[in-house]
Amino acid sequence: MFVRLTLADVKDGEMDNALEYVKNTVMPSYDEISGLLGIAACATNDGRFMAWSTWANEEAKNASVDKFNEALAGAAEMLDGQPEVMEGPMVAGQQYIGVSKEGGDGFFARFVLGGGTQEGKTYDDVAEFMTNTVYPAYENVEGIYGTGACKVAE
């Protein structure tokens, strides 16, 4: 699995417009994209726009990049500068519930961005920790959507 995370500063008063644009324009443009597993967007607690997508593999993500850029072009006027993009292969991931693209209740997303692994540890160690410790701990937590770890840098 492959994940892409985008963070962007949004011009004052444009956050709701940016989120609506993603919901009403970007997401529907992905209906026929092969290999897309999920896409979501939110406003962060520090006022930034955040969007993420998960893919079957990097090739599926790369095959859709032109369509992605075309769909996002309309949001440029709402942004205050260039977005920051992080992407990489998932080293571990677990989804607990599904969220419908038709809408309904929103959900809360929490991302923890780190700078790699601890000295002497590998991404295999991260995957093992997630699989053996984090996933079982969250298995019966009501309302949790998913957890994961992604390798974005060496």
Residue ranges of model-derived segments:
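Short S/T/G/P-rich N-terminal loop/turn motif that feeds into the first structured element of a domain
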Residues: 1-50, 54-154
